[in-house]
Each structure stands twice: as C-alpha cells, then as structure tokens.
Amino acid sequence: MKQTILSFLMFVLAMPFCAQEKDTRHEVLLETTAGNIRIALYNETPLHRDNFLKLTRKGFYDGVLFHRVIPNFMIQTGDSLSRYAHPGDRVGDSPEYYQIPAEIVYPKYFHKRGAVAAAREPDKVNPQRASSASQFYIVWGRKHSDASLDNIQKNMTKATDGKATMPAEQREYYKEVGGTPHLDAQYTVFGEVLEGMEVVDKIQQVECDENDRPCDDVRIIRATVIR
C-alpha cells in the first residue's frame, strides 16, 4: 500500500511537467568526474533558464568544482574560480558582477529530491532573494516527519508573510521521498534532474573537509546544452 501511495504521488507531481513541458524544456548534460547528470530547465523561470543556457554555451561550467557538499542536503557548484583551487583552499566566494531577480514559482516548483535551484546571499543582505549569477545546487535532502513539516510551515509562514502554504501532496512527498522543504518559497527552483540521481547520491556521500568541500575534487568536466 505504501509503495502504491508513493507511486501515485510521483505520478501526480510529474503530471504538469509531462502535460505542459515535455516537448519544450531545454536540457543540459553535466558530465562530472562522478558520472553524468541530465537536467531540464523550467520555462516558468525564463531569466534563470536563459542565464544558465548562456553560461553553459560559453563553457563557463567546464572544470568547476562541486565546492560545497552536505550529506542528506545538497551538492553545490558554479564558483567560477573553483576550477583553479588548490587542495584545501576555501572556495565559493568568488566575486559576481550581477544577480538574477528571484523567480520563485511556489508551490508548483519545490525543493523535492533532484530539484535544481539557484544559490544566493542571505535575506539580511539580499531581502529581494535575488539569485547568484552562476552558483546552483541540486537537492538530495531527507525524509521529514509531520512534526518537522509543521515546524517548517511555521517558519515558511513567517519568512513569506503568510503567503506560502505547503500543499498536502507536497507534505506526503517530503515524508515518503524527501527533500529540503525549509528552502521552499525562498529560493528559486529552476530545473530538475531527469537522469543521474545515482550520481547526485554518490557525490552527496563523499568525504568533505570542515568547509564542506570534498577532500577529493569532484568537478564538472563539461556542461552541454543537449536540447
């Protein structure tokens, strides 16, 4: 019965993508030292989509590290100078010359496992929640209890002035599959992994130093627009 419910949830959550975007979404292939990850970019976040496509076509992501990896949370990449980092260097703070206005399409796009979202500076210095020009993360996350989700909803209500409410089907997804719901409605989710979640899993389990940088470099060898 539990597996049936989970299968139904996955089907329901995928329906909008299949019905509306199956033939129109751009796709990018990330060839990494841990394996390949294929992602789709959402058309409802056009500024992030177009920026990501532009950077990919310029070769911006070729050679950059996954510089911040936290198990049962996410893997982050996109720091322009990380490709030149020496072992043990702290990376992730390279200067950026622009930001992308937030395109938070919640609750349609949420921090499910496999979500691709834009990193950003904290609310204190970035109240508009504008996104990093290049850094992004892929969600792994964990399963959550009802008590955990109740607490997250309280924090979400406060962070969004009561504008965001977690739908019942998302609560079930977070309980059955997992993700990072505490980031919902506050960070721009602009894509999702189509293939290669086993690679994401492999990366999120690697040994890291005190700065969450993998002890053995994991990098994007090449990023290519494939659709």
Each PLM stretch: what is its role?
Residues F17-R227:
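Cyclophilin-like peptidyl-prolyl cis-trans isomerases
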Residues M1-K22:
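Bacterial Sec-dependent N-terminal signal peptides
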